[in-house]
């Protein structure tokens, strides 16, 4: 299900907590969804009962990645993620970091890619303080949205990566 604002997910979070279900949270741009994203999201969902994915708004992606990004508008990125059987909820954030969402939802598990070093994961101290878990999932080698875009722009076939 797509929640236009993360605050709309709060009643569902209360229901999950009351039912004793474990909530997993991750976030990212998810522009040009690729197999690396799929592997990470599927592994994230396996860590709990429900997975919520917070995606950067278009303005947030532009501020991080530059004026030519995102390639895919936020509504379409959300629709694609929502169609995945291992993603239970999708929401958006326009702030530079997802800290406000993390502290409000208090996920049981916070997931990021293994490229995020110790102390670099936004929300890690907070999640650990309330007894949650922070998991860094190994990245599938060879996948990067930026690399895919560069290959397309240079005319290099993706098969020759």
Task: Annotate each language-model stretch with its function.
Residues 1-161:
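Nucleotidyltransferase catalytic core that binds NTPs
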């Amino acid at each position: 299900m797509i929640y236009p604002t993360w605050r709309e997910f709060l009643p569902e979070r209360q229901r999950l907590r009351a039912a004793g279900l474990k909530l997993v949270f991750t976030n990212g741009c998810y522009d040009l969804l690729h197999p690396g994203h799929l592997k990470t999201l599927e592994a994230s969902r396996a860590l709990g009962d429900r997975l919520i994915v917070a995606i950067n708004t278009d303005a947030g992606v532009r501020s991080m990645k530059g004026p030519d990004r995102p390639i895919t508008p936020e509504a379409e990125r959300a629709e694609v993620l929502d169609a995945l059987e291992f993603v239970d909820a999708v929401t958006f954030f326009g702030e530079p970091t997802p800290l406000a969402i993390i502290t409000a939802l208090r996920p049981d598990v916070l997931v990021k890619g293994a490229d995020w070093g110790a102390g670099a994961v936004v929300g890690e101290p907070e999640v650990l303080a309330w007894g949650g878990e922070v998991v860094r999932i190994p990245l599938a080698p060879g996948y990067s949205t930026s690399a895919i875009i560069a290959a397309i722009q240079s005319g290099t076939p993706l098969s020759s990566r």
